[in-house]
Amino acid sequence: MALRLWASSAANALKISCSGATRAAPAYSISRYFSTVLDGLKYSSSHEWVKNDGSVATIGITDHAQGHLGEVVFVELPEAGAKVSQGGAFGNVESVKATSDINSPISGEVVEVNDKLSETPGLINSSPYEDGWMIKVKPSSPSELDALLDPAKYTKHCEEEDAH
């Protein structure tokens, strides 16, 4: 009985329904490991996401990446005005498991840094796509965005990577 109640609560929280009712598809997809992949973003194979707002692109690490890292305890980011290059490291994330470089999915100039992360690096774990964003960049080569993965391709990439 307790298991059934838990399953029902989990299904409600995840908005999963087994009934024949149809509803609009959510704005995200969930891989088999329950990492959230948002529609409307582009992704790199090294697990960074980009939200392009025209003249400025917001960058962070994906839910999949933070899940593999574990609890984030420290973040090192560049200062505003720094230049970043596609595929080049712009900072690092230290977790209870490891320290990992953060690679820029696009080239450009850093116009804003999420200063909240220096005091509360755990925002990367609790809200990787909202409060846990890392830097905002003015892209120097907007066409680089076209080479990034869409949500479906990124989800497939994660599933293939986790299978090995």
From Swiss-Prot:
Cell compartments where the protein resides: Mitochondrion; Cytoplasm
Cofactors that this protein relies on: (R)-lipoate
CDD domains, per database record: GCS_H (cd06848)
Main location: mitochondrion
Cofactor info, note text: Binds 1 lipoyl cofactor covalently.
One cellular-component annotation, GO: glycine cleavage complex
Residues annotated as domain Lipoyl-binding: 56-138
Keyword Hydrolase listed: no
Role this protein plays: The glycine cleavage system catalyzes the degradation of glycine. The H protein shuttles the methylamine group of glycine from the P protein to the T protein.
Name this polypeptide is given: Glycine cleavage system H protein, mitochondrial
Organism: Oryza sativa subsp. japonica
This protein's encoding gene: GDCSH
